[in-house]
């Protein structure tokens, strides 16, 4: 979250027996076990999301955590830090796509607890192979090319695990940008259900 946007974050004021308490909207929603994953996935954002997941698990490991996703994707390593934490903690994680879940955003959407992965009707999801770029000596370029192929194979295995698709289908479907509507994402196995209303 960019510090210069803090003045644009709404504040919620609650009344209690001890007086008033002001929360920024995201902190208030965190009290309800709702985490927002919004914007490009990068290291700072991943660290905040991981910390929120760990905090909510420590508060009550038997209660669901709700992860709302609106992301164009981003860093594979940052996304995998969130993914691994989602798989590591005891709490079930309900994922809900609002807007878009592309690239690593789509991987995190499908990584929610089976039966608890949702999208709103007008979202778009997109899966593809990881992007990479490197310049330097030929031997170093080759090392990085081999690494990106390993990363691609790993991401494909994760999609296979959560969607139920066979690996050949995942490889073909992630070869280029592959956009899906909410209904198509349901048929593919990225999500379990499209939600029109609560």
Swiss-Prot record:
GO molecular-function terms, A-Z:
ATP-dependent peptidase activity; ATPase binding; serine-type endopeptidase activity
Q: Where is the active site?
A: 103 (nucleophile), 128
Question: Catalysed reaction per UniProt?
Answer: Hydrolysis of proteins to small peptides in the presence of ATP and magnesium. alpha-casein is the usual test substrate. In the absence of ATP, only oligopeptides shorter than five residues are hydrolyzed (such as succinyl-Leu-Tyr-|-NHMec, and Leu-Tyr-Leu-|-Tyr-Trp, in which cleavage of the -Tyr-|-Leu- and -Tyr-|-Trp bonds also occurs)
Record localization? Cytoplasm
Q: What GO cellular-component annotations does this UniProt entry give?
A: cytoplasm; endopeptidase Clp complex
Q: EC number(s)? A: 3.4.21.92
Q: Does the keyword Isomerase apply?
A: no
What are the alphabetically sorted keywords of the record? Answer: Cytoplasm, Hydrolase, Protease, Serine protease
Please name the PROSITE patterns in this protein's record.
CLP_PROTEASE_SER
Pfam families registered for this protein in UniProt: CLP_protease
One annotated GO biological process: protein quality control for misfolded or incompletely synthesized proteins
Give the chief site where it resides. cytoplasm
Tell me which SUPFAM superfamilies the record gives.
Answer: ClpP/crotonase (SSF52096)
Respond yes or no to whether keyword Metal-binding is given for this record.
no
Q: Which HAMAP family match?
A: ClpP (MF_00444)
Please describe the quaternary structure of this protein: Fourteen ClpP subunits assemble into 2 heptameric rings which stack back to back to give a disk-like structure with a central cavity, resembling the structure of eukaryotic proteasomes.
Q: Tell me, what does this protein do in biology?
A: Cleaves peptides in various proteins in a process that requires ATP hydrolysis. Has a chymotrypsin-like activity. Plays a major role in the degradation of misfolded proteins.
Could you say which protein family the record assigns here?
Answer: Belongs to the peptidase S14 family.
Name of the protein in question: ATP-dependent Clp protease proteolytic subunit
Protein species of origin: Vesicomyosocius okutanii subsp. Calyptogena okutanii (strain HA)
Q: What is the lineage of its organism?
A: Bacteria, Pseudomonadati, Pseudomonadota, Gammaproteobacteria, Candidatus Pseudothioglobaceae
Q: From the UniProt record, report the name of the gene that encodes this protein.
A: clpP
